[in-house]
Amino acid sequence: MSFTVAALGNREACAQFNPNGMEGAKRKNLDRPVSLMSLAVRQGVDSAELRGLCYNRFQADITIECPQMPAKGTLIKAGELTLGILLEGKACWPECVLFQENLPCPLIDGVRYAWVENPGTLCLGEVFEVVASDNPA
């Protein structure tokens, strides 16, 4: 499975990634250096009428176009950059209206966090490929 880079959080054509994440990005949790979001979820969040608490807060470092997000425990690579998808996922907040009304939140399945296995530069249109996975396909 492949994942095409549709947008970068710095709104530039390319970004540099080091072991701490995307250079210049603000990090809320140092244990989750890189955040990824699917393009379909990004578009859904942007056009939603009922907005969850995280809709305005969450900023993805990388937006990827893909039929489904990379599995947790997977290593993905684009050029020299290799990311490892963390097992930790996006959590819900009790004060969120979606959580309170038991409504689905697209961020739960449409967001992944990753560590930088091998630093490198990533540009729009580049394609991540799975290079290793803990999950048999």
Q: Which sequence ranges carry the predicted segments?
A:
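Active-site scaffold segments
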Residues: T82-L86, P104-E117
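Well-ordered alpha/beta subsegment
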Residues: R112-A137
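Short, basic/aromatic beta-hairpin or loop at an interaction surface
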Residues: R51-Q59, C96-V111
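Short intrinsically disordered coil segments
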Residues: K77-G79, Q100, E129-V131
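Electropositive, beta-rich accessory/interaction domains or terminal extensions
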Residues: M1-P94, T121, D134-P136
